[in-house]
């Protein structure tokens, strides 16, 4: 066990050193800060439990170095430390709570600029030198390059000796403009700013629009007592400071501090520069000295960092996927990138029209996001590295049938298409539908390829004992598959109706049908025999549109679909589902909800199911058409978006009565 732990520590140290070089020296990081920080935390945890394996070269005792060989190394007059950081607001609040302000609350909050750290040295009011942070003890002398930044005064009105800390950055607009002309584009504005600053020829640097904010005094010659006085002094001396820095005193509360952080978080995409969090600092310098320092960071400051909402990557290939409805969806295979807490290697391109609108082809560098914090999508082309635009093929990749365009999408219209068939079976077995345990995509694909099944009906006629002769299918697994199939026969009618795959008929629409007394196969079948009457009846239900109405009518007049229903009825499936309809249910019927956060004593899935049973419609993301957002503790980015769109907010107390 000890050897295994020692090896993990060594592996972590090696990996972190590699990432340090990529970030600080090459300006080409391969992982997001969130991933890096999690590895640092893991290393700290192991070293804390096993101090016998902690060595002096551990990254937990140091921070990364940006020292380069082609610049002179100069010693800093004071240690240039890093910042401690958290990704959780509760941990940030805990840090504030632990500080003894002695009844004199004083905190400053400012955006954490995602740029390149710099230290400026003034002698008698004249800029003497500018050093990168380096390894905290030594930095590279980039004075000539820094002198080209017009926001840095070369001479001050006062003859003072100063050591100042700032952040060199480049605006979002200039990042996109410059990146288009670079042979090897940068993945972030921070990396571009860092790369420009490290150019050997200062004449080249002068051609780029670098910017800077100064945010700290590192020497005490001016005898300033608080951070607000220090920032005011910086302004007076002619330095550019972030206008969004705000100071909170004894008249303020932690709630006001957290509200301001929420405000910055909400508005960050509108800022002209990239930020990756906010920085909180104790304002009183006497208290700062009392709180002290570690070898890594001051104890009087804390960075609250955001998880990345988007990232940049290169498109390596584009594959065309065929869905259960025959819809063709192009998907980009991209270099691995970390966005919103997950690694992404594939991102949807929606359809051919979308590809044309962004001018995308294989080889281009793109911006990737996770829409609704779930579905990865390509947002735009950052750098056009290839000629032309990708074209979806004319024929289905699975059955070679000529594709037909309906609206913005291409479809394979072949009902016997193998890709369509296998996707329908996967959908039927999926968790949201019949939830047939053990039938993974891999298992279903195996059964389909061996021609044991060709439709969902075959799941109930196939002799699963035939699988015993195949590798990976032992007695217990086969027995579990059979039991899962039997258990699925007891599922409610709403699940069967969803699983059968009527085009665009989802859980919410089914719930609306049931609330309007269309809660059985026989009722729906009888209604749809008179197409005109069925159409007008369905359109009277709020939330049922023309497309869904026509698809329902078509399905209940289609012989293949009706034969499926008849098959399941003969097997003993439930073909009717009772639902309690009262005045309370009607208040929620058809209303569109979304949910975020955690709820004491209730999982989100339970809340969703209970409200769905009363007619509520649940959406996965916040949009303009949403009626309500239910907000629990630790609410995410959905709350920010809902406030921007003026969506009504409901607390747990507001919905509690509906959960009984």
From Swiss-Prot:
Q: Which residues cross the membrane?
A: none
Q: Which UniProt keywords apply?
A: DNA damage, DNA repair, DNA replication, Ligase, Magnesium, Manganese, Metal-binding, NAD, Zinc
For the ligand (Zn(2+)), the binding residues are 396, 399, 412, 417
InterPro entries hit by this protein: BRCT_dom, BRCT_dom_sf, DNA_ligase, DNAligase_adenylation, DNAligase_N, Hlx-hairpin-Hlx_DNA-bd_motif, NA-bd_OB-fold, NAD_DNA_ligase_OB
Look up the record and give one Gene Ontology term from the biological process aspect.
Answer: DNA replication
Give coiled-coil spans as residue ranges: none
Q: Which CDD domains match?
A: BRCT_DNA_ligase_like, LIGANc
> For binding NAD(+), which residues are annotated in this chain's numbering?
33-37, 82-83, 110, 133, 167, 281, 305
Domain BRCT positions:
583-660
What catalytic reaction does the record list?
Answer: NAD(+) + (deoxyribonucleotide)n-3'-hydroxyl + 5'-phospho-(deoxyribonucleotide)m = (deoxyribonucleotide)n+m + AMP + beta-nicotinamide D-nucleotide
Is Lyase one of the keywords UniProt gives this record? Answer: no
Q: Per its record, what are the GO molecular function terms?
A: DNA binding; DNA ligase (NAD+) activity; metal ion binding
Top enzyme category: ligase
What cofactor does this chain's UniProt record say it requires? Mg(2+); Mn(2+)
Q: Where is the active site?
A: 112
Enzyme Commission number: 6.5.1.2
The family database entries (SMART domains) matched by this protein are listed as: BRCT, HhH1, LIGANc
| Pfam families the record matches | BRCT, DNA_ligase_aden, DNA_ligase_OB
NCBIfam families under this entry? dnlj, PRK07956.1, PRK14350.1
Q: Which family does it belong to?
A: Belongs to the NAD-dependent DNA ligase family. LigA subfamily.
Briefly, what is this protein's role? Answer: DNA ligase that catalyzes the formation of phosphodiester linkages between 5'-phosphoryl and 3'-hydroxyl groups in double-stranded DNA using NAD as a coenzyme and as the energy source for the reaction. It is essential for DNA replication and repair of damaged DNA.
What is this protein called in UniProt? DNA ligase
Q: Which organism is it from?
A: Borrelia garinii subsp. bavariensis (strain ATCC BAA-2496 / DSM 23469 / PBi) (Borreliella bavariensis)
């Amino acid at each position: 066990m000890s050897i295994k732990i020692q090896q993990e520590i060594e592996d972590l140290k090696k990996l972190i050193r590699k990432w340090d070089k990529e970030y600080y020296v090459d300006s080409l990081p391969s992982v997001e800060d969130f991933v890096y920080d999690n590895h640092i935390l893991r290393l700290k945890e192991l070293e804390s439990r096993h101090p016998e394996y902690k060595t002096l070269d551990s990254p937990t005792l140091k921070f990364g170095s940006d020292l380069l060989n082609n610049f002179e190394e100069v010693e800093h007059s004071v240690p240039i430390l890093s910042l401690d950081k958290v990704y959780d607001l509760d941990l940030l609040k805990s840090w504030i709570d632990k500080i003894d302000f002695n009844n004199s609350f004083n905190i400053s909050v400012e955006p954490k600029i995602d740029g390149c750290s710099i230290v400026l040295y003034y002698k008698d009011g004249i800029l003497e030198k500018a050093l990168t942070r380096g390894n905290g003890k030594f930095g590279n002398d980039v004075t000539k390059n820094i002198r080209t930044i017009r926001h840095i005064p070369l001479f001050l009105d006062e003859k003072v000796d100063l050591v100042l800390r700032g952040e060199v950055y480049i605006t979002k607009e200039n990042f996109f403009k410059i990146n288009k002309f670079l042979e090897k584009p940068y993945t972030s504005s921070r990396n571009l700013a860092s790369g420009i600053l490290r150019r050997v020829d200062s004449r080249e640097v002068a051609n780029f629009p670098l910017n800077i904010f100064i945010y700290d005094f590192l020497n005490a010659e001016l005898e300033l007592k608080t951070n607000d006085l220090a920032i005011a002094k910086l302004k007076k001396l002619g330095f550019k400071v972030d206008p969004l820095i705000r100071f909170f005193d004894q008249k303020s509360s932690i709630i006001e501090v957290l509200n301001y952080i929420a405000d910055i978080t909400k508005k960050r995409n509108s800022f002209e520069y990239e930020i990756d969090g906010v920085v909180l600092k104790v304002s009183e310098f006497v208290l700062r000295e009392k709180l002290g320092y570690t070898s890594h960071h001051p104890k009087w400051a804390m960075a609250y960092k955001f998880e990345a909402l988007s990232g940049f990557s290169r498109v390596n290939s584009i594959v065309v996927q065929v869905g259960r409805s025959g819809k063709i969806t192009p998907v980009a295979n991209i270099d691995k990138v970390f966005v919103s807490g997950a690694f992404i290697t594939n991102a949807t391109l929606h359809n051919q029209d979308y590809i044309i609108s962004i001018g995308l082809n294989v080889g281009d560098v793109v911006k990737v996001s996770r829409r609704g914090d779930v579905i990865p999508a390509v947002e735009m082309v950052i750098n056009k590295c290839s000629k032309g635009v990708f074209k979806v093929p004319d024929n289905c990749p699975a059955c070679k049938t000529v594709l037909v365009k309906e609206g913005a999408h291409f479809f394979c219209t072949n009902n016997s298409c193998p890709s369509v068939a296998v996707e329908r079976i996967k959908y039927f077995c999926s968790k949201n539908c019949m939830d047939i345990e053990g039938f993974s995509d891999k298992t279903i694909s195996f059964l389909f390829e061996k021609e044991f099944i060709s439709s969902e009906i075959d799941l109930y006629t196939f002799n699963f004992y035939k699988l015993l002769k195949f590798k990976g299918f032992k007695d217990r697994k086969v027995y579990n598959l059979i039991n899962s199939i039997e258990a699925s026969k007891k599922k409610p009618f709403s699940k069967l109706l969803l699983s059968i795959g009527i085009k665009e008929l989802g859980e919410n629409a089914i719930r609306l049908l049931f609330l309007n007394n269309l809660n059985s196969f026989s009722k729906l079948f009888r209604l749809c025999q008179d197409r005109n009457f069925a159409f007008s009846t369905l359109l009277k239900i709020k939330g049922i549109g023309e497309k869904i109405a026509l698809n329902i009518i078509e399905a209940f007049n289609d012989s293949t679909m009706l034969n499926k229903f008849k098959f399941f009825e003969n097997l003993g499936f439930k073909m009717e589902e009772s639902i309690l309809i009262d005045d309370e249910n009607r208040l929620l019927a058809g209303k569109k909800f979304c949910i975020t956060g955690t709820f004491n004593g209730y999982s989100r899935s339970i809340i969703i199911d209970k409200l769905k049973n009363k007619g509520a419609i649940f959406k996965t993301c916040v949009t303009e058409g949403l009626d309500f957002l239910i907000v629990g503790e630790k609410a995410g980015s959905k709350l920010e978006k809902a406030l921007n769109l003026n969506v009504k907010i409901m607390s747990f107390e507001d919905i509690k009565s509906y959960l009984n």
